[in-house]
Structure formats: C-alpha cells, structure tokens
Amino acid sequence: MVTVVENIDPKIKPVPAVIKELEEKYAGKFVVQHTVDEIPTVWVARADLLDVLLFLRKLPKPYVMLFDLSAIDERLRQHRQGLPESDFTVFYHLMSLERNSDVRIKVALSEEDLNVPSATQIWPNANWYEREVWDMFGIVFTGHPHLTRILLPKYWEGHPLRKEYHARATEFTPYFLNTAKQQYEQENLRFVPEEWGMKRSGRDEDFMFLNIGPNHPSAHGAFRLVLQLDGEEVVDCIPDIGYHHRGAEKMAERQTWHSFIPYTDRIDYLGGVMNELPYIMSVEKLAGITIPPRAETIRVMMSEFFRITNNLLFVGTFIQDAGGMTPVFYMFTDRQKAYDVIEAVTGYRMHPAWFRIGGTAHDLPRGWQRLVREFLDWMPKRLDEYVKAALQNSVLKGRTQGVAQYNTKQALAWGVTGAGLRATGLDFDLRKARPYMGYENYDFEVPVGYNGDAYDRCMVKVEEMRQSLRIIRQCMDNMPQGPYKADHPLAVPPPKDRTLNDIETLINHFISVSWGPVMPAGECTTIVEATKGLNSYYITSDKATMSYRTRIRTPTFAHLQQMPSVINGSLVSDAIMYLASIDVVMADCDR
C-alpha cells in the first residue's frame, strides 16, 4: 500500500477498516489518497477494478450501494502531486449503511486508451452512470449492455466535460436551424424498439409502443417515457431523459466559487437553499472555514422550510394524479404562507441564492419570530385535514397501496435514497446517521413505511413535514446570538467595514468580490438529506478562483433509472402513480 497525502495532515488518525480489509486482500496493489472530506479513497489498476468492486460488494458488512460514478479530466490539473499519472480518472463512490461509511475507488486512464470494464453486473444502477460518463467524457465501458448518449441527443458531437470542449456559447460557431436540420433532429427522436432489444410482437400479439411525454402532465417535467404495451400491461419501458439538461457541471468550471451559488438553486428548483447547502459546505471544508452557531441554525431553519414547500407540492400533485383535484389548491395556500416567511428572511422566494461561503447573505430581519410562529401554528392542523379528507380516502388507497412496490434490497441496489428508501422500512436519514449543521442537537423522528409502495412513499413525505415543523420550532426557540458569517479571509463576500481601515484590507476585499477567492487545492464531497433524497457535491479544487471539477449527484437521476424494474408487468395507471410517488423534478435529474 502506498499513501499519498493531499492538502491535509492526516495526523495519526486510525486507518479506516475498509483500507485494512483491502490491504489484506490486495497488498501493494493500490494507492491510498487522503482527501479533505476524509472519505477513504483508493486508486486501483484497471485490471483489478471489477475484482475490488466485487470484493467490497461482498464484504461481511457490504458496500451495497453504488452512490455515484463519474469521471474527471485530469489533463490540465496542476496540483496533483504524488497521485498516479492519469489523463482521465473514473471514480466510484460506494456506500455501506451497516458501517455507515463510504469508500471512493479511482481508476487512472490514459488518453490513448479510454476503456474501463462495466460494473453493471455488480450494481444495476451503474448503467445510467456509465452512459453519462460516455456521454460527457467519451470513456468506453466494455461490457455495457447499451452504451449510448443519455443526457444529450444521439446526434450531438463531442463530449462536453472534456477540458478542450468550449464552455461558452460565444466560443462556438453561430447556431442555426433550417428545415432540413429540424427534420433530421426530429427523426432522431423516433423510437426504434430493436435498438433496445425489444420485439415488436409476441407469440400471439403485436405490442403497442406508446410515448408519454416529453410534454405530458403526468411526466412532471420535460421527460419522455416509452412504454411497450400488451393491452394495458406494461411489458417493458424506456425512460428517456436529458430534455432539461443545461450543463450545470460545465458551468461550475467557468464561475467563481461565489458566483456559482445561484446555479445550485436551479438543480432541484423546488429545493431552494437546500440545493446550496452541500455545495457551500464542500467549499467551506476546502477553505477550512468553521461557521458560527447562529449561521448553522439559520441554515437548518430555512432548509426545513424548503423541505415543507417541496413536500406540499409533492403531496398535492400525488393526490391530483390519482384523480383528486382539490387538495393541491389548498396546499398552494400553505406554500404561499411558507414563502411569505422565506421572502421576508431571504428577499426571494423559490431561488434565493442566500447561503454564502462562511454563513448567510445577511442576518434574520426584525420580527422574523412572529412570522415563523404564525406558520407553525397554521400548518399542523392543515396536515391533519389533508390526511383525513384525502389520504385516508378509499379510492386513493386503492390506486396506490400495493402499487409500484419494491423492497429495501432492491432500493439499495438501484441507489434509492430519501423517502423512497425509508418507505421500505429502513430508517436511514443522513441528518440522524451522519449529522451535519448541528442536526444532532435537534429532537425529531425519522418517519418510515413498511410496504415500499406508492402510498407509503407519500405518507412518509407527510410525516417528514411534521418533523420539519418540530425542527423549525426548535430553531426559533433556541436561535443563538452572535455573527451570521464566519470571520475568515476566504468567507465571501468579506466584511465591508474593514475596507475603511487600511489599504491591505481594501485590496483583499476588491480581489475577493471581483476575481473571487482562491481556494486551497484538494477534493471534497458533502452529502445532505435533500428534499428528494441524498444530494452531493464532489468538488475538485486546483488552487484557483473557480472549481476544476464539480460533480453533482442528484436523487432523481437514480430514482428514474429504477422505473422499469418496478413497473414492468404492471398497468399503465400504475406507471403514472409510480412517477407521482418518487417526487420527480427533471432539472434535478438532468442538471
């Protein structure tokens, strides 16, 4: 075993158990990299990759979930001293719930030989992640069952997350769309069953191929679902994503650490400041910033407000998709009351871009307690009414109980997190399992279901709102005094009043707000329990004013990939309720 220290002093910390287990099996065959996030990170040879992954998957306390899989173009990276030589690096982020720990496996590739074996036989959810890596980097996964583009159309040229690929529209030749090109692009949308291994007919029947979307109210966004039908029964289905792709990870490479914050709001556009939290926390870890208790508490309170607004919309549209048209309008009244508080605190509603590196944009306004207290007094009885009037309705139960059902083992294999995982009976909530932002100081419960069906997923979301109300009340009652931003040279923006003292502070302020701060070189992942499941930002800094690589892992991407395994053999109406029950936001999926 070779150890490489990156940016931090490992101090004499005990060697993680997984590293010891790997050492016993693969002594001398891997390199350990110490990263800022302290996730055990191991470089292995391509020839050993599948063997190592399978070993980790079959340990006594196994790494059952492939949490993330992506790549980094290393060719322009300056600060990677001591790391294995690599033009492109593929990384696998694995998670063990029994150990409550993660491990990161890396494989170095040369530009002349961008091939790596597929992991789809070990984790089924590797399928989409590997397709995305091929789409964005051009890395080939040998043995993949269907290695095609996934976020970009099939006629796209190039691989956008390579460093030579332009990041701004002004760097490209002018775009034009004539009739011939439009027809060509439309023709490329034609679904060809044979390309997906589907048959057009069975022994005694012809199958129907039905498009749902990309513009359909039940799709909950720009999303296309192709169904192979035998009457009303779904024989197979192909989720087609990418219509909402905006290149968020590429944008992060051209924005300063501070100016990228508004882009995070638009990943899950219903999550508000919840989107900002994992990004901000990763940057703060890189910079070594410890935020004050008041800033922590404010962040928790506002994050839980957005959890409530998200879940209200989810429950309302869930009931609507089952045929109940009225509750969603009542829930918009509740959301408006929540947004009144959010707007009073942040100045904005859905996309406040309010968290800052080191704290928040400003302090809480005068009278904030009254607004929060009024909402806390209003909301519980409304939830009781929705449960009694709509969610206990026998028609809704008939449409959702036992529908789109899966168990804990299946959920973990597909990378399902959040309410979708807890509805199977597993009480895994990152706020409890790995507390961050002081969540260990709050008294709240983790709602779980038992059947893993559409109905349980909805009821878990309802109970989540009750727990969020408990957390918000504790924030209000125990709000610390003190500053709302850290006193740190890399906090952005820096204190303006100090610019009046001397020329040095004036220069530092000017550089920080114009060019942006220079973050130390290193790598850091932060995961949070977001509105739809686990959301993470894996940031690579090359000691510059902007990120070298920003990987955004979102829950919706994983949840949609699971769809065929859940609904094949069910009815079309069950497919609609599955989509309604997993809290889909396509911007969260496509990034």
UniProtKB/Swiss-Prot annotation:
GO MF assignments: NAD binding; NADH dehydrogenase (ubiquinone) activity; NADH:ubiquinone reductase (non-electrogenic) activity; quinone binding
E.C. number(s) listed in UniProt: 7.1.1.-
GO cellular component entries: NADH dehydrogenase complex; plasma membrane
PROSITE patterns: COMPLEX1_49K (PS00535)
Gene3D superfamilies given in the database record: Cytochrome-c3 Hydrogenase, chain B, NADH:ubiquinone oxidoreductase, 30kDa subunit
Region NADH dehydrogenase I subunit D, residue ranges: 206-591
Annotated localization: Cell inner membrane
Catalytic reactions of this protein: a quinone + NADH + 5 H(+)(in) = a quinol + NAD(+) + 4 H(+)(out)
Class of the enzyme per the UniProt entry, highest EC level: translocase
Keywords from the UniProt entry: Cell inner membrane, Cell membrane, Membrane, Multifunctional enzyme, NAD, Quinone, Translocase, Transport, Ubiquinone
Similarity field: In the N-terminal section; belongs to the complex I 30 kDa subunit family. In the C-terminal section; belongs to the complex I 49 kDa subunit family.
Chain's role: NDH-1 shuttles electrons from NADH, via FMN and iron-sulfur (Fe-S) centers, to quinones in the respiratory chain. The immediate electron acceptor for the enzyme in this species is believed to be ubiquinone. Couples the redox reaction to proton translocation (for every two electrons transferred, four hydrogen ions are translocated across the cytoplasmic membrane), and thus conserves the redox energy in a proton gradient.
Protein name per its UniProtKB record: NADH-quinone oxidoreductase subunit C/D
